[in-house]
Structures are given as C-alpha cells and as structure tokens.
Swiss-Prot record:
It is an enzyme of class 1 (oxidoreductase). Mg(2+) 2 binds at D190, E226, E230. It holds the Pfam family KARI_N. Its cofactor is Mg(2+). InterPro entries: 6-PGluconate_DH-like_C_sf (IPR008927), KARI (IPR013023), KARI_C (IPR000506), KARI_N (IPR013116), KARI_prok (IPR014359), NAD(P)-bd_dom_sf (IPR036291). This is Ketol-acid reductoisomerase (NADP(+)). One of its GO terms (cellular component) is cytosol. Substrate binds at S251. Pathway: Amino-acid biosynthesis; L-isoleucine biosynthesis; L-isoleucine from 2-oxobutanoate: step 2/4; Amino-acid biosynthesis; L-valine biosynthesis; L-valine from pyruvate: step 2/4. Residues 1-181 form the KARI N-terminal Rossmann domain. It comes from Staphylococcus aureus (strain NCTC 8325 / PS 47). Its EC number is 1.1.1.86. Belongs to the ketol-acid reductoisomerase family. GO terms for molecular function: ketol-acid reductoisomerase activity; magnesium ion binding; NADP binding.
Length: 334
C-alpha cells in the first residue's frame, strides 16, 4: 500500500543544526539549495569551477570545491549527472565522509547498480522530486510544491528516515506529498518510463508516423503537424486530466479512431517488447551498457545522437517553427 507523507507527518526537524552540502548547481541543485536556504538551513555548494560555480556565488551561497564542501557537511546531497557521479564520489566525496554523515541522491542509478558503494557507517537516502528543478523552485516560491519520492538505502545513525523526511520538507515537497519507495523501485521505474514511453517509445512512435505519411506521398510539413506538433495539445490534456480528459476533449471521430486503431499500432507484441526492456533494466544489462560506453568516451551514445539529429523530421520542424513566433523555439547547436 502506498504511503504518503505531508508537512504534518514530519514531527522532528532532523536537519536542525546540520550543515548541508549540495553537490552540483544545475537544474535540481539550484532548486534544492535555494529552497533549503529559504527555509533557514545552512547550505553550502560543492562544485567545480565554471558557470554553475559563478551562478551559485551570484545567488549568495558559499561555494567550495566538492571535497571541501563535503568535509564541512553533515548531509551531502549529490545532484550531478549519473555518468560523472561515480568519479566525483570516489575522488572527492568518499575520502571526506565521516561516520553518521548522510549521503543523499535524487535518483538511485549509481547506488542501485553499485557504481557508488558507501561505507556502512553512513546514512544513504533518496529524495526525488517528480518534476524539473525550475518547477521545484517555482512552486516552492508560490507556496505549493512538486510531489516527490523518498527512500532509505541504509540507516547507520538510526536517524536516516527522519533526516530524509526533514530534507523533503526542507525543499517543500511535503506540501504536496512525499511517497515512500526504495532505490530499486525508483531507479527501475524511472528508467523504464524514459526508455519505453516518455523518450524512447514516444520519439520512435512519432518518427515512425512521420515516415509512414511521407513514404505514402504526403507533404513532410503536414506529416510534421499531424504527428509531432499536435502532440503537445494531447499531452497537455492528458497532463491535466488523464486519458479520460483527452477523450472528452477530442472529436468523436478521433475518439473512435483511438479505440479501433490504437490496438493495431500498440499490439500485444509491443507490450512484450516493453517487458524485455524492463528485464534489461532489472538485470543490469542497460546500466552496464551505459557505464561501459561512458568509460569508452560515449562512442555509441554520440553516434546514435548524430544519427537522430540528421532525421528529416528535425529539418522540417526547424523550418516550420520559424512560421510560429508564438512558440519559444529552441535550436540545439551541434
């Protein structure tokens, strides 16, 4: 049964008197740090020199190299990209951990797959907002919040649970609700959602729809409008009220087509393929492939990225977006 915690459920402020080091000052890092600071906590930033280092200073934080930030902290929240966490942990975090420090993450990848293996005498917890950093920050300022997940991997001090919930409250998450989970569940469901649906599944569905229309002789511009541009209209309806809201809002023709043609596209074989994707996540095949490719300079990753960048749908999209000044268009430089 799902357990959800709110402000009133966090009885003890286990962060009181503790120094928090936020390692990283990107999307999640700036939101966590600023929300904690606004709630009165002692926050320092650990980061390497660069734009984010300068931005954190501009925002009024004490900023240090990662090792120095960790040395002075009781709670260390690691908010770096998955692929660099392992090296930063090994070289800058682990040598400076002390007994009963708390090591925290917003995604469980490196803990769950064993890239990072903390010593047994530190707490390890997860607080994972279910939204991007700018939304975590904006909703906090507005007095609301983004729902979040939390979980405990190890509790050496006996206070890991209280610290995790206090941290979740500190970034504002308990205003909306914090769902209890595990590193395993958070990691595997997050990766599956990205690969099978949100990123991999949707991108290939759109691309295949575009190719089907163009190969049948239809204008690429019309194909783009029908399978990519209008996707936002449907996703917004889904976001606001689920599939029922989509079906309530679209025409009867579209709804009928949903029922009779959807199962022809997403067949039982597709679900079996999804299960295979999930299995590769669960057994470590995907993580091993990602980790090894990272060690080899991301040769496979960059090759795949370049292949997708050259697809016709991207060229058509760039041209059509110039006709729509109401869209805040983004061109990704290569």
């Amino acid at each position: 049964m799902t357990t959800v915690y709110y402000d009133q459920d966090v009885k003890t402020d286990a962060l009181q008197g503790k120094k928090i080091a936020v390692v990283g000052y990107g999307s999640q890092g700036h939101a966590h740090a600023q929300n904690l600071k606004d709630n009165g906590y002692d926050v320092v930033i650990g980061i390497r020199p660069g734009r984010s280092f300068d931005k954190a200073k501009e925002d009024g934080f004490d900023v240090f190299p990662v090792a120095e930030a960790v040395k002075q902290a009781d709670v260390i929240m690691v908010l770096l990209p998955d692929e660099i966490q392992g090296d930063v942990y090994k070289n800058e975090i682990e040598p400076n951990l002390e007994k009963h420090n708390a090591l925290a993450f917003a995604h469980g990848f490196n803990i769950h797959f064993g890239v990072i293996q903390p010593p047994a005498d530190v707490d390890v917890f997860l607080v994972a907002p279910k939204g991007p950093g700018h939304l975590v920050r904006r909703t906090f300022v507005e007095g609301s919040a983004v729902p979040s997940l939390f979980g405990i991997q190890q509790g050496a001090s006996g206070q890991a649970r209280n610290i995790a919930l206090s941290y979740a409250k500190g970034i504002g998450a308990t205003r909306a609700g914090v769902i209890e989970t595990t590193f395993k569940e958070e990691t595997e469901t997050d990766l599956f959602g990205e690969q099978a649906v949100l990123c991999g599944g949707v991108s290939k569905l759109i691309q295949s729809g575009f190719e089907t229309l163009v190969e049948a002789g239809y204008q690429p511009e019309l194909a783009y409008f029908e399978v990519l541009h209008e996707m936002k209209l449907i996703v917004d309806l889904m976001y606001e009220g689920g599939m029922e809201n989509v079906r309530y809002s679209i025409s009867n023709t579209a709804e009928f087509g949903d029922y009779v043609s959807g199962p022809r596209v997403i067949t039982p074989d597709v679900k079996e393929n999804m299960k295979a994707v999930l299995t590769d996540i669960q057994n470590g095949n995907f993580s091993n492939r990602f980790i090894e490719d990272n060690k080899n300079g991301f040769k496979e990753f960059y090759k795949l990225r370049e292949e997708q960048h050259g697809h016709q749908i991207e060229k058509v999209g760039r041209e059509l977006r110039e006709m729509m000044p109401f869209i805040k268009s983004k061109s990704i430089e290569k």
